[in-house]
Structure formats: structure tokens, C-alpha cells
Amino acid sequence: MTDLGSDLGPIQLKNPIICASSEFTMTLGGIRAALKAGAGAVVAKSVNEAPGAARQLDIAEYVMLDSDWAVASWERAGLEASLFCRSGLAQTPLSEWIAMLARADAEARTHDAFVVGSITIADAAPAARIAATMEAAGLRWIELNLSAPHGREAVAGAVRQLADPEAVHDYVAAVRSATKVPLTVKLTSQSGDPLALAEQAIAAGADMLVLMGRFQGFMPDIETMQPILGSAGAIGGRWALPLTLYWISKCFKALPRTTPLLATNGMRCGDDVIRALLSGARGVEVASAVLLRGPGVIGEMFAGLETYCLRKGIVRLDEIVGRAADAALGYGALAPVKRTSYPWDRFIR
């Protein structure tokens, strides 16, 4: 029997699979569906105080891109499809939204799970006030999203993406001072030094880190010669998994081993969850897979993880967390590779 619980420090999850913040978790119905599917936690759609952020939902658009970067049918898109979108924040008035989340989290207790309140930042002080209000309403866990991929494209003052370590420290410290509940901080990899962002988030009081947010992207349609979506957008896909796991592994090795890391961006199946754990994550946040395949994918991921652990004789998830990261050598420590030819030699005369 394998214990698939995950130790996230102040949070003990029944399993490491978290339904990430997305349009799927923008309604009570979506949150309930993810809980019913077996998610260890569900991160609600983000909110903030900026009217421009809420209005961004009015221009939201979502497409799946296939491996040829063409728009694909949602019903036929496979595991390799990439989500390319403009998304927005929940438009429900904050007081109503937070009250709904509190009710949802009360329901989550009956599933031995959590509903997490998510804040995408515009300014630090309002984010801190929202966090305090969430705690006062009874929420047990808050996520601070500093990685909003639309930050560079949105109207001024709507949302921000923080890529400066000092700014990360200041925003996290402001929210940490306003609340005592466990705080997760979601970071971007589009920075000169993502590890420095992680270090500053922890120094400022983050309990857990989520790595890494989606990327800004641009893709033309070669037939119409126009930009898909009519603009830039945020993009993520299974192709991003090695990029996510690179920074998970680096943070796992550089930060104290007591720092819980959550991987996001690129997980599509149970095997990908395993890859994240081997890289140093203690859990995963999945969004695109749920949007594409429905909340049933959560149960499929859990089943894949359970089958793997039984096959490998793993009793606790801690046995595999970071195993591959610890085995990774720096280039300078690698032995010379002995070879007599290269694969591309067949093209050379």
C-alpha cells in the first residue's frame, strides 16, 4: 500500500495533484467538479482590486494549437496540444467571490481537500487587504500569483508579472504581514534569475513556491497572415515540461529541503506527475489538461501515479521526491563520452 499524501509543510495534502487556477475554477460548479474528481486542492480563479483586470475577461479568447502551430479542435486536440489564450480575472464582486470561496472550502473539508484563494497582483497593499479578507472569511490557504503572463500586454495597472527579486520580496512581505494562513507564491521563469526570485519569496515569508507560470507568446496564422487571437497571448503546453522541471530541480537543490515546491506548466498525464516529483516537486498544479480533457484527468493522473508507485515498491512519495535532481551532475563532473560516430554523420559524405 502506497501513501500518496504530500507534505507541503503547513499543508498536508491527501495527494499531490492540485487543480490550478483557471477559467475552470471560476465558478462554484467547476470547483466542485475538481473536488469530486479527487484533487488534493483546487486553486480558485485569481482576483485583484483592479477594474481593468476584471474587464480583461471581456476580451478573453482561448485556442488549442497542434504540433504544427495550427488551431486545433478542442475535441480532437491531443496531449501535445498547447493552450494559447488571453484570459481574465473573475468578475464577481470581491465580497461575493470570497464568501463563495469560503463556502467552497467548507465543502472541500468533506473531501479532505482545500480550496485555495488566489490573488494576481496589481499593487501590493490591495493584495494584502484581499489576503486578510480571505483569511477572515475562513479560507485556509492563499496563493499569490506574481507570474501573470498577461502582465506585459494588459492595460496599465491591471495585472503585473514580477521578474525582479527585490519586487518579489516586497510584494510577498506585504501579503505575508497581512495573513497567517499558509501562503503559496507563483513565480515566472521569464526573469534573468528565477532562482533569485525563489530565494526572495522564501525570505519574505512564502511557505511554498509554484514554478513556473506560462510564457508570453505570439503566433501568426500563415494563411491569413494575421496573428492568432489578434494579439499576443499566454502559452503553455507539454513542450514546457523540461523548462518547468529545470527550475524545479535547481530550486530543489539550492533551497532548504524543507521548502515545498509545486510544478506547473507541462503536466498532461500521470507519468508527467512522476517526472515532476523526481525533479523535486512535492505536488503539481494542472490547468490546461483539465480545460482540455475535463476534471476526470485528475483521477487518471492519480491512478497513473499509484500504479507506478506500486510497481516500483514505493511506500511514500518522499522516497522519490528529488531523486533525479540529486543524481544530476554539473557538466564539469561528467565523464567524457566515448563515441565513434554521430547520428547526423549519415548526411555527411
Could you tell me what each predicted segment is?
Residues 32-37, 41, 110-111, 122-262, ...:
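Alpha/beta enzyme core
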Residues 23, 48, 148, 215, ...:
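Flexible, active-site-proximal loop/turn residues at the rims of small-molecule/cofactor binding pockets
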Residues 101, 105-108, 138, 179, ...:
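Structural signal for hydrophobic packing residues in well-ordered secondary-structure cores
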Residues 1-115, 120-128:
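N-terminal capping/small domains of soluble enzymes
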Residues 51-67, 220-236, 291-314:
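C-terminal helical cap(s) of enzyme catalytic domains, especially alpha/beta-barrels
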Residues 45-46, 265, 287-288:
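Short beta->alpha connector loops at strand-helix junctions that form conserved
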